[in-house]
Amino acid sequence: MALLRRLFYRKPPDRLLEIADRVYVFDCCFSTETMEQFEYKNYLDNIVLQLREQFVDSSLMVFNFRDEGKSLVSGLFSLYGITVKDYPCQYLGCPLLPLEMVLHFLRLSERWLMLEGQQNFLLMHCEKGGWPVLAFMLAGLLLYMKQYNGEERTLVMVYKQAPKELLQMLTTLNPQPSHLRYLQYICKMDDELEWPIQPIPFTLDCVILREVPNFDGVGGCRPIVRVYGQDFLTVDKRCNVMLPPSKPRKHARRYKQQADNISVKLNVGSCVQGDVVLECLHIDDSLEDERLMFRVMFNTYFIQSHILPLNFENIDVSWDAEQRFTKKFKAEVLFSEFDGESDASIEVASDYDDEVEVGSIDVFFEAVEIFSNLDSQEGQRDAEILSITSTECSPRAELMKTAPFSHFDMEIGLGGSQKNKIDGMVLSLEKSDEKCTSAEGDIIQNNITRVVRSSSANTTDGDRDTMNSSCYGGKVDGCIVEKNNSNKEILTDSNEDSGIENVLVKEVIISETNSLKDIQMIKEVIISEVTTSKPVIEVDTIGTELSDVVHNSETITHAEANNEEEVLVTLKQNEGDNLVEECIYYGNSIMIKPEKYRKKEKSIIGSTIGVVPDSTEENSRVGLLLSVKPHLDSTGTYHDLNSPLQKIDLLNVSNTNCVEEQTKGMEASISNSYGQPSNLSSLNLQPQGSSFQANGDPTCANTSTDANESTQLELKRKSFLSLSTSSIFSPLSPRRNLLRSTSTDLSFLSPLQTKSNQHSIPCSSGRDDFASSYGPPPNIPCTSLRTSKVSSLVHPSLRPLRTVSSLSQSSFEEYLDISPPSPTFHEKHQQHFNLDPPSLIPPWQLRLAKTKENEIYPCTLSFLPLSPSNKYAHHPPFPPPPPPPHVLCTQNNSRTQISEYEQGRVEGPCPSSSYGQSILNSHDVSLSLPQKDSSCIAITNGPSSSNYVEEVPMETILNQPTLSIPLEACKDELLHCKENGGIPIPPPPPPLCDHAKKYTRIPLPPPPPEGSHGILATTSTELIDAGPQLPPLSHLEWKRCPHHPPERPHYLPGEVGGAPSPPSPPPPQRENTSVGIQGGIPPLPPPLPPTLGDYGVAPPPPSIGAGAPPPPPPPGGITGVPPPPPIGGLGGHQAPPAPPLPEGIGGVPPPPPVGGLGGPPAPPPPAGFRGGTPPPNAHGGVAPPPPPPRGHGGVGGPPTPPGAPAPPMPPGVPGGPPPPPGGRGLPAPPGGRGVVGHGLTRSLGLNSAATARRSTLKPLHWVKVTRAMHGSLWAEIQKQADANSHSEFDVKELESLFAIAPKTKGGSKSDGASKSLGSKPDKVHLIDLRRANNTEIMLTKIKMPLPDMMSAALALDDSVLDADQLENLIKFCPTKEEMELLKNYTGDKETLGKCEQFFLELMKVPRVESKFRIFAFKIQFQSQIRDVRKNLLTVSSACEELRGSEKLKVIMEKILFLGNKLNQGTPRGQALGFRLDSLLKLTDTRANNSRMTLMHFLCKGLADKSPHLLDFYEEFVNLEAASKLQLKALAEEQQAVVKGLQKVEQELAASESDGPVSEVFRKTLKEFTDASGADVRSLSALYAEVGKSADALAYYFGEDPAKCPFEQVTSTLLNFVGLFRKAHEENIKQIEADKKKAQKEAEKEANQDRTPVKSKDGLVDRSPRSPFK
């Protein structure tokens, strides 16, 4: 088996570590170095390429462990189509993951690796800091798949794969104990264990420390305990909060090791469930700094006997904490059963009630009762309690049902003393066939977006952050409830997309506003946007719940989850501690929460909340309107609600709008048109197909306009994903100018009329049907974006503006819903409003009503029909405003252009929901353009509110032309429109000339015909199948603004061509509205080219034929009103264009002065019905034709009176609007000429340049000298130049040699350019351009024709093609897809590119890639056989040399003797032999003088006694070469040769049926197989013999071949030989050094003995000399 394992072993790719079979780890995980992005990309590219090459048919999956944020790994691997699964690298600071996540990882890994029929691979990767959790997960995977046994052994093995310092560097505490605990959890689990597991809830009572650790330096500590984990009272498994500490810091007691022999008990009292992290911290004497003593992570599922015993071995401590803990340290974590009736946290709090700073004990326990015992609250309520049971239940509601206490009856206690049982208050959840598991619950609860909106207008950001940081948060079924010390409740939503953008934009507004006044005003602005940002969804099951009050806060939030949007509305009072109504939607249930405690009683008007379903099916849907009215009593008494629950009617509607009003200091006395009171309990809204209309108007009774006295909606700042706001807020943004300049006048929420006894009937038609035209209560006008919104009426001038380019579709939709202002209305005015007769809904609205929500284009402009009072029912229309004087003005370039689309709208759009199209109604709204400021457009009210003017800044930008209507959000719809005959979208208009931009202006529309009945009605110009403009409704009303006389005209520098948009034609009768669109909608015309003169030129009027396109709108959008639509539409005839303008006319007739000497140019003649006859207007007349213009820019005359014929414009009339002139090289329109006058075209210059003679010779690209300096060479040449100096050159020959080659096809340069642009390319490319280029580059290296190359390849001629060229050919063989592409090509194959020709040549040979590979194998076969045989012979020779060496045997015997001598009397003594790696330990055993080792001693002994053994290593000739070889690599090479020959034989058999094309190939290949077969067989036999010799060598030295393979044997012996030779050489050097030293000493002594010393008297002194003399 060991041989087979080595035989089939495949070396893993470089930079990967194989942990288990098909489980690899990137080696970058074991390093702390950080690679640059480019280097990291190359690192991954190389690994993936190697994996693709080695495992061609395998699939890869990457598990990445990382922190939060964007991961580079996912993006890189996605380029290769490799799946990446991201996991966090810590859980609450502990390098572990929750048990359920660990099980998910293990199950997924096992299924991936065990997938039948596939060989999948797992790649493990961790980003910086993720190695600890990756090591744990790897160990868990090995244990889970039964590849290893023993948790600690497996974990230590994985730890050792990385440097030891890496784990200490990444973690402050040693995570091994917690890792082992969770590995034991994994091993305890078997197949019968329920997964996912259901953790058992416990109450963590206390932590007992049996030994006191030393953390204060004097043998003691001051401990506290913190517990982190899932909040037990919520169902959100991701809501990980810090549970309350055992004691406050200031009450933590200090314990000593010796003085306190008793155990330390730290009370906790927290509810825990699932994965829990317990930390024990030491507080220093200053009570400020803390230090973590130990940490424990565990799961409550495995708690046994209500105790978790701990000791020093199974707690996470710091790496140097051994000195602080004794080895006898023990601790215990005690638990108790969780009791739902009494929360343990109450008991713990009561233990320290003297330490908690609260007002009183009663207040404390009352608050605890509210927050923790929701199932046992009972008492009185001030609001009506509604309970609706549905037969359907969503998975989220099913999940809610499994939550704690969800099946209990809800009882509310109010007042503490008096408690009344509410019989009907039961949270009912009907169970459906659909079951929601906890795993699905995780999916439901993913993507939680916590959008927090705060409370007070004067609250600073720091205060908000401080308040939010101290929150104790929990989440109940998608609705996060954060409870903080200030007794405020912040309700946030989950899974809301467009709401995020709204909050972000508002956050940016606040960040750019400096003063509190601006912040106050901004928060008023965003009331309607917050309340209309999300549609209210279908509610299947509605329950009620009453809870605590939240003072001084006002939040409106919306939630959406799992295709069922959940609405979370909290309406609260801003001033004082007033009664608060809360309506919370939990999944499919509604809980209405009134205030329990009030320090002082105040009366308010009840809030009314409207809820409408967003349905997705054709069956009946439920919409409900809740009328929540608190009984107002100034004495503070409560209204007992023991009466049965009030019913609410279910409505089959698609769009509603709910108008809310809050007024303080007064009792609500809201009446309908008949004076009936509004404190009624039920409401019935009539279904109206696709719209809601009302005969009443929302009013505001005694509404204060002071922002400080009004109810405010505040926004709490919270960080979100980044959004580009450069286009939203420029330094001179109109948003900021508007916010800083506009007053804070605000119309507040008006009460809802709630009494109706008529039952609603579903309506399937597209008309606005009413059950009663004059019912007692008026229905409420409702607007909608997609579906109904909870909306408030806000001062429209305070609404923030957005540029189209910076907003997404969802967020742009939310900006279009603008309610009409009604700040001056009173309730008495309601009697003047009657129901407007129903209007027909065009068929396009009916069709759009059935489209999906995401197909509706949001950019809709609607002018709402007025619902006039009886007094003004037949009031004639107001005269049109006079045009402004002709004054030129310029605009600042740095300002941001505001879409005229937004400037002109009075109400938000009315796009269809899933089943209806809403038509918006507003009351007394009219439009007026003249303003007191030149940059504003006024939108005024009707007669009832004529004193109110809304100003919208109209500032434009010059640098970038924009489309009139944003088109980015409707690409899919536009494609659909084109297929169904809809409109195409025009290209963007060309830019203006610099000198023409400053003269463009906006014309004013003309007055409509008489008899409009005072109703302002326009169509909703949506770009969905409807064309540029829809047939207008009957009437248009204009009102002059008396307070702001015009001062100067408004000029838009960005307007196309400087031409004013033509005025709107008179609309046809209403009965023709829906008929006029049946003939198809004409397409939008292309944009006008830029003008060339100094003054703009008016565009031509629409042609008389039906379906004539209107002129394009200006780039900035629609100025006030949409462009005029074509009136006809039934016919498809096209009229001839308007006659051109004669020469000399350079401008448009200027508008008449203010005095009224004429109006603006009248609209063009409308198209007729199938015959060109103009349709009659409301009075039966015809539309007025354009006035006869005056010559040379004169003032236009008055329009033709109604009834007059509409003669066409005769050609050549001065002053007529010409067609769009050509500009800067563009040809003029047909039949027209270029505009002559102030702005001349450059055509003359271009023509003169074109007529200039061009040289026919090739140019010499030199640097020209135009001025010869005095004294220079060129100056002298100029003086001496004469006519004969150039005669020596033959000019004709020069011209013939250097002439420009004539073009093969005639035509001028422009003709050639246009022809080359319009004609097809010479070569047709079917293959990817990059691959084609690489193929052509490769073919340049093969310098032979393609047929010759193929012949050489089929002949297996290695003299023509080498191995490198074949590798390139194999790499660029066509794939199956490319072959199919070329086979399906039916065109001329001669026109194909070189790459395609090459592929076609290869496709002529069957299985060409296989043949190339056979050819490459044949070329490399002999060299491969030779190399493998040589290496195998080297291994075999080395084995024979080692086994046959007698000298080595004697040396091993002597080493055995020395070892037994040293180990005599120890367990290691009396050994019969020793392991081979013990040879290397001879150098580790040193003598006393530290210069001699046992190896030196061995060499010395052998040199003295057996010198013939010292050269034993000379017998090992092949040892060094063999040590560099690996049998595994040789096995792969040998197997490659064998498999290669098998493929050769397979191809030989397959080529039998190829026919003549493979005849030569088959013959040559047959000869090759006959000769190579014997070589392969002999090689296999040699490999088998070598394998046996290698195993025999291991057995010879007493080793197991499986544990000590051949490579290890040879490397060990080679190292021993090196150490032996080194020691022997050192011994020789030492002996020589000793000899030299002894010789010197002997010579020195001899010299001293031979030298006599004479004394002073001449006698010889025999005594030795003193060294000091």
Swiss-Prot record:
Residues 1036-1050 have a biased composition (Basic and acidic residues). PROSITE patterns: C2_TENSIN, FH2, PPASE_TENSIN. Residues 5-193 form the Phosphatase tensin-type domain. GO terms for molecular function: phosphoprotein phosphatase activity. Residues 1060-1069, 1098-1127, 1136-1190, 1198-1230 have a biased composition (Pro residues). Disulfide bonds: none annotated. Residues 199-338 form the C2 tensin-type domain. SUPFAM superfamilies: (Phosphotyrosine protein) phosphatases II, C2 domain (Calcium/lipid-binding domain, CaLB), Formin homology 2 domain (FH2 domain). The active site is at 126 (phosphocysteine intermediate). Residues 688-709, 1025-1240, 1631-1669 are annotated as: Disordered. Keywords: Hydrolase, Protein phosphatase. Pfam families: FH2, PTEN_C2. Residues 1247-1646 form the FH2 domain. Belongs to the formin-like family. Class-II subfamily. This is Formin-like protein 12.
